[in-house]
Amino acid sequence: VKHEKKDQWTKLAKGGINGPIPTLFYDYDVEDIRRDITCVPFKWTSDNDGDIAWKAPNKCWGGWSFGKVRFEWMNRVVDSSNDDGMNWQVMRMADIYLMAAEAINELEGPKGSSDAGKYLKAILDRSYPAEKASAILTKAKASQDAFFNVIVDERKFEFAGEAIRKVDLIRWNLLGSKMNEAKEKMTRLYNREGEYADLPLKIYYNEGLDGTDATSYKMYGLNHGDTDEIGQTLGYSKSKEWIVPKESADQAAALLLIDQLYDNNPDTKQFWPIWKVFIDGSNGVLTNDYDY
């Protein structure tokens, strides 16, 4: 989760720069326990470095935080100014289960003797209420393609923010199509059209969002079916236009973020080019190929 200044949990000047695009929050089922851990709509801020921080709603566009790794959940204060000391996870058991399910489906389909579904089921049972987990598994077992599509979604939901989604999409040859899909979804969200038409214009919250409470927040207006009419009656002290920012400069910034989700064809420019400083220092050994 983003920290704007040094505070009661960290002496780093900032943290939590990267975050999900806002449509990811709405891709999750509302009862998926991973949603509110992964997609966090607030940041920690304060008036001055070293002050006690409080929660503030972050920008819808370019402001969400990934919430799986949080200074405020650690049992020590990060007292270094340049290193948080966290050990980054390389592989989780969920990755092994979903890889097994994917591999078996490719070899045997969803109804083969090795039972790809049992590995998928373990992830679904942990994430959803029993009835929804069963329904998703039944949908997946309808065909090999259906099972693959569920795997694509579940790996998104399970590993968002863990730096493996891009390589998954590359190996499936889906990077370009999913990036296009993201632009289209974000445009519909900005216009509150299609699957986002029932979202309210504003979010409603209290000043400070429960202050230093590190484990929860109260905010109305994020979910499908929330309305501005109800939000105005709930007694929150603050509200703000969020999906479509009120200020024209913020509107322009949001549209620019959508447009710049990618500049080059993702399927032909999948990786960073080699930086010029490394090429210059390689004694002619390194070059950028493939039209970089």
How would you label these PLM feature ranges?
Residues 36, 117-120, 152:
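Hydrophobic face of alpha-helices
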Residues 144-183:
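Acidic/serine-rich, low-complexity amphipathic helices located in mid- to C-terminal regulatory regions
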Residues 1-99, 106, 172-292:
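Elongated scaffold/linker segments in the mid-to-C-terminal portions of large proteins
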Residues 116-119, 143, 147:
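Stable alpha-helical elements in mature extracytoplasmic
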Residues 132-141:
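Cytochrome P450 fold signature focused on the C-terminal beta-domain
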Residues 85-130:
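Extended amphipathic alpha-helical segments enriched in small hydrophobics
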Residues 37, 48-50, 134-135, 162-164:
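Short, solvent-exposed loop/turn and secondary-structure capping segments
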Residues 44, 129-133, 157-161:
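Intrinsically disordered or highly flexible coil/loop and linker segments, enriched in small
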